Amino acid sequence: RQRQMCIRDRYIGELYMGHLRYSTTGKSGMSYVHPFLRRNNWRSRNLLLCGNFNMTNVDQIFNTVVSQGQHPRIYSDTFIILEQLGHALDMEHDRLYREYRDKAADGNGLARLIEDNINVDNILRDQARLWDGGFVICGMTGSGDMFALRDSKGIRPAFYYHDDEIVVVASERPVIQTVLNVGVDDVKELTPGSALIVGKNGGISVDDILGEGENRRCSFERIYFSRGSDKDIYKERKALGENVVPDLLEAVGHDLDNTVFSFIPNTAEVAFYGMMEGLEARLAKQKADAIKALDASAADYDRRLAEILNKRLRQEKVAIKDIKLRTFIAEGASRNDLAAHVYDVTYGVVRETDNLVVIDDSIVRGTTLKQSIIRMLDRLNPKKIVVVSSSPQVRYPDCYGIDMSRMGEFIAFKAAIELLKDRGMQSVIDETYAECLRQLELPMDEMENAVKRIYAPFTDREISRKMAEMLTPAGTRAEVEIVYQSIDGLHRAITSCPGDWYFSGDYPTPGGNRLVDKAFVNYYEGNADKR
């Protein structure tokens, strides 16, 4: 009867695990789909693994696994960690086998004793200390134990909820709220360095595995990846939009009468609301000052007062996006082709004397801007196009789970390199390469980010101007300017997640400095596909 139920009901188990992880290797295919499975005839030795992560020291972990006598078939962080934790599970299994082999009546009884007494802490504690990276790693044994472990600096997000009937862990809070219909205070953040462990008997604990380190929660999660429906993220994205108002006003000469404001769908919409609120506040002050300056006894007082009160910001839905397509997470080979077919525009809302301001959540590679957005916006014949980024300039690669690992992909980096060449400063590029090679000879915990030298000679605005020049397609009629969020503005908006290595180059772990130096060496040596 139990077998018939399992056949009839596909999802009949008590534990479910999966991850909608887009490949951070720049590739796709079934071999990259989580979870990964380590099989064994002993039920308690089976292990499933999935996670939101990348490790920066896969070679070190690989060498540790090999030193234990293993010979892994695949060299990837997920597979190596699966084998590492699988070996630790085997050791825990053997410990319990020795302890209970004389106390069990038969093999099945011994297997049950082992399953009932597996200590997940023993599996995680020593192994996880070898990991350098940002991670939330979830695992499940064949006997029914489950765990979710978060890195000690909180780089990758994790939230959980439990009651008498269910335990759930996810990377985002609002999805738990929506699916289970629970309040925001019912969903807890998994403490960095801790593991949520659910035993086969239903017991739940949050155990300190690595200790909580310095807070380096990832700010880019909040800007782009996470759902904007989260209570805190919604406020943060609005604040990001408001913080760019002074610089965008300067870009349009404070001419609100001849400026149309819009956004690049879809993740920038909330930042757009914040930007408009900031502009409304400034317009309200302008109105108040203008009213105070009026002569109430003048014959045209009523007309002039009405003109002031009727002033409105011109906001329109100018860009239209196919909601099914996201160019940021597309594979490198298809990104350019995809970018040209994602957007359309609304005609008839922009005059030839207008500035057109559009805000986007971030400008990383600039592919979509050059291949599609600027071309489309220029068809509306504005005098000037101002593209505003709610995030700062993305200057450095990520190595903790977001697919931004090649140095030469970043438009900010390309712009800095071009500026160095324009000004006869090739020596800075050569010296940076030499310093990166020197850094890579040091122990990992002594390495520094040598790539900061590339940006040091220039101001943010100089780099932004060069980016605008490089991203403006040939034949564009409008003047194009790019305005970026400042790093200070980022931190004022997102106070709880100070991890800003993409923008500042200040990596949260030693492995980050190693990989950024390695990324520059690959770029300099012409190995564009290496990560």
Where in this protein do the model-derived segments appear?
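Conserved short alpha-helical segments that host acidic/polar catalytic motifs at enzyme active sites
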Residues: R1-Q4, R8-T191, I197-V260, I264-P265
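Amphipathic alpha-helical
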Residues: E99-I118, L279-D289, S297-A298, R304-V318
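PRPP-dependent phosphoribosyltransferase catalytic core
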Residues: Q127-A128, S143-D145, R150, H162, ...
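Phosphate/ATP-binding catalytic cores across multiple sugar-kinase/actin-like superfamilies
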Residues: L130-G133, R237-D257, V270, M275-G278, ...
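Active-site proximal loops enriched in glycine and acidic residues that flank catalytic Cys/His/Asp
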Residues: G139, R150-D151, S171-R173, K200, ...
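Terminal amphipathic helices with adjacent charged low-complexity linkers/tails
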Residues: G203-R217, F263-T267, A271-S297
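Short glycine-rich phosphate-binding loop at a beta-alpha junction
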Residues: H254-T267, V386, V480-Q485
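Extended, hydrophobic alpha-helical segments in both membrane/secreted and soluble proteins
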Residues: F261, A268-M275, L279, Q315, ...
